[in-house]
C-alpha cells in the first residue's frame, strides 16, 4: 500500500475516476477521504457505532491510529522499554499515550515547542526535551545509559530523523510515521548505521 501513496493510486492500483474532461484523478494517500462521500478499499473502513460522537471519532482516523499504531504495532514497545517520541502534535501525543499503554518505563517527549510539554506529561511522558537544546542528545544518552530502545519520529522533518538516530542505544530501533514532503531526502553515515 505504501507504494501507491506517492503515485496517487488506489490500493488495488490505478484510478477509477476522471474529471469532466476525462483526465485521470489521483488519490491522496490511497484513501482520499477529504470529502463528504468517499470510495475506499474495504481494508480502510471501520464501522462506527451510531451512539459514538462523530467529532470524537474523527481523531481515530489519523492521530490515534498513527501515533498509537507506530508504538504498539510497528515498534512493538514492551513493558520496561525506553522510548523517545519526537514531535508532539496530535500524532506524537498519541504516541505518548501508546507508549504508556505498552508499559514503557521511560517515555521521552521531544519537540521544538516547550508549551507542549505539560500536555505530554499529563499523557504519560516521564521527561521532556526542547530539540533546540544543543546538549539534548548527550542529556538523553546520559539519562538512558547510552540511548533509548526506540526513537519514534512523528514530526516528519529531517531534524527529527537526525535526532532519532543520535539518541538510540546500540541495537536500538528507529521508527518513523511522520509525513515529510514527497521529495524529502534523508541521509545518514552508513558506518553509523552498521555500528548501531
Please state what every model-predicted region is.
Residues 146-152, 172:
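Short SAM/SAH-binding signature in class I
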Residues 37, 43-44, 49-134, 138-139, ...:
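Mid-domain Rossmann-like dinucleotide-binding core that forms the NAD(H)/NADP(H) cofactor-binding site
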Residues 1-45:
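Glycine-rich phosphate/adenylate-binding loop and adjacent beta-alpha elements
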Residues 77, 144, 155, 167-169:
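A generic alpha-to-beta junction signature in SAM-dependent methyltransferases
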Residues 96-97, 121-122, 141, 163-166, ...:
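Short amphipathic alpha-helical segments
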Residues 158-196:
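Glycine-rich phosphate-binding loop and adjacent beta-alpha segment
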Residues 124-128, 146, 192-195:
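Short, hinge-like loop/turn segments at secondary-structure boundaries
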Amino acid at each position: 500500500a505504501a507504494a501507491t501513496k506517492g503515485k496517487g493510486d488506489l490500493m488495488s492500483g490505478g484510478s477509477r475516476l476522471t474529471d469532466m474532461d476525462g483526465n485521470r484523478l489521483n488519490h491522496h494517500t490511497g484513501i482520499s477521504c477529504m470529502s463528504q462521500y468517499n470510495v475506499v478499499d474495504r481494508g480502510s473502513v471501520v464501522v462506527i457505532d451510531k451512539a459514538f460522537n462523530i467529532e470524537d471519532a474523527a481523531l481515530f482516523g489519523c492521530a490515534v491510529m498513527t501515533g498509537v499504531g507506530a508504538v504498539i504495532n510497528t515498534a512493538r514497545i514492551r513493558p520496561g522499554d525506553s522510548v523517545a517520541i519526537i514531535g508532539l502534535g496530535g500524532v506524537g501525543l498519541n504516541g505518548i499515550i501508546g507508549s504508556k499503554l505498552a508499559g514503557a518505563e521511560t517515555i521521552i517527549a521531544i519537540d521544538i515547542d516547550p508549551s507542549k510539554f505539560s500536555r505530554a506529561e499529563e499523557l504519560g511522558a516521564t521527561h521532556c526535551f526542547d530539540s533546540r537544546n544543543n546538549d539534548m542528545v548527550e542529556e538523553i544518552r546520559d539519562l538512558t545509559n547510552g540511548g533509548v530502545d526506540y526513537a519514534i519520529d512523528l514530526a516528519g522533518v529531517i531534524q527529527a530523523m537526525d535526532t532519532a538516530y543520535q539518541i538510540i542505544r546500540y541495537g536500538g530501533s528507529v521508527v518513523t510515521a511522520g509525513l515529510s514532503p514527497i521529495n524529502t531526502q534523508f541521509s545518514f553515515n552508513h558506518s553509523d548505521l552498521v555500528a548501531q
